[in-house]
């Protein structure tokens, strides 16, 4: 996986985030619900399709790409359910190269992490000036089905920095690659608590965007997965 953490709104920020991305062909039924597809340069795009239950099905074989849609408001709790019927073997998501995964559900935020330095902020400001009125996410949390599950060893909060977008994206493995397949799994995450844990700041910025991605370019594995009913919910 080369460029997880880049979102559709950050296409112009691609050099900053670790690679070039470009708009892809979005299926009309997904586009009608606000999704936009994008592809990574040099990687064959995966297939995203709408399911009868208004979810998203992802199919890939040695491919990778993502879809994104706006999601605005305070960082509350995010819930969804997903399943993987076929996916890649366990890979180390904490290192560059070979870091494949079946699905990642990522959320973009309006604010920088405390660790974002002058260079990163300056590059972002230049990209924002070129992007126009649509705000570009400045940080992201990515929840992954894949990996070994040991990438965040020693971290009590379970997050680790993306090897491709340090300072912008922190990842957390919710389901490792060897998790049971062929069955639905319900998820609920507290975005506010997770942002504080991952980035070390008490002030949590608003959320801006939702991204679903897949990448099996390195292992050339096959993916057949679904995610549905993604929604903001009250935190219990």
Regions found by a protein language model. Name each.
Residues 7-18:
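Bacterial N-terminal signal peptides
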Residues 19-42, 118-128:
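Extracellular carbohydrate-recognition regions
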Residues 45-66:
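Short carbohydrate-recognition loop motifs
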Residues 68-78, 178-181, 203-204:
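Extracellular/lumenal carbohydrate-interaction signature centered on repeated Trp-anchored short motifs
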Residues 81-87, 110-112, 192:
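Solvent-exposed strand-to-loop "edge" motifs in beta-rich extracellular domains
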Residues 88-109, 115-118:
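Beta-strand acidic-aromatic groove motif in beta-rich domains, primarily in extracellular
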Residues 100-105, 161-171, 176, 181-221:
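Extracellular beta-strand ligand-recognition surfaces/modules
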Residues 107-165:
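Extracellular/luminal beta-rich ligand-recognition
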